[in-house]
Regions:
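Short, flexible turn/loop "capping" segments at secondary-structure junctions
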Residues: 1-3, 71-74
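Histidine-centered active-site/metal-ligand motif
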Residues: 8, 53-54, 78, 110
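Core segments of cupin and vicinal oxygen chelate
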Residues: 12-60
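Vicinal oxygen chelate
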Residues: 14-17, 74, 79-125, 130-136, ...
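Short, charged/polar surface micro-motifs in flexible loops or helix N-caps
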Residues: 51-55, 63, 84-88
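Short, basic, helix/turn surface patches
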Residues: 61-63, 131-141
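Short beta-strand/turn micro-motifs at beta-sheet edges
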Residues: 64-70
Length: 153
């Protein structure tokens, strides 16, 4: 067997409508299915940027569900979403996030990406990034492990 690509992510969320609004309206990820009600199981919503049938599925688990544990631990660290190809698009994203009341928790120059970090309504960390000089990391994949620097845009 050989994995050929990462297909999709599924997140459990406390409040489907709140998360649907965040991923769909704030971040602009197109919702591709109607929001399913919880009448015959958990509520759910699927999203896709068009690369595949869906890149993100949200499943509602209710308000009493536990938050992701803080700090270093095993499990998912964050999801990364490519938002464009230029620092201008990253600057636009900063303005849009601030206008929507989203806190930017970090910003890094990873040599291969310029990245912003935020949290979704359930505390899942997200990386919003642009590729930097894709020809460089294609020629030298070790650049992915380059030291992280502060982002200055």
């Amino acid at each position: 067997m050989k994995i050929v690509e990462l297909g999709h992510a599924v997140l459990y969320v406390r409040d489907l409508e709140r998360s649907r609004h965040f991923y769909g309206d704030v971040l602009g990820l197109p919702q591709i299915t109607p929001t399913a009600s919880g009448a015959h199981g958990p509520g759910a919503a699927a999203f896709s940027g068009g690369r595949t049938h869906h890149e993100l599925l949200l499943i509602e688990v209710g308000p009493s569900a536990a938050s992701p544990p803080p700090g270093r631990r095993t499990g998912l660290y964050h999801l990364g979403f490519k938002i464009g190809t230029t620092d201008d698009e990253l600057r636009d994203a900063i303005r849009e996030l601030q206008d929507a009341g989203v806190t930017i928790t970090g910003a890094s120059d990873h040599t291969v990406t310029h990245s912003l970090y935020i949290e979704d309504p359930d505390g899942n960390e997200l990386e919003l990034y642009i590729d930097v000089q894709p020809e460089a990391w294609r020629e030298d994949p070790t650049l992915v492990m380059a030291p992280t620097k502060p982002l200055h845009i």
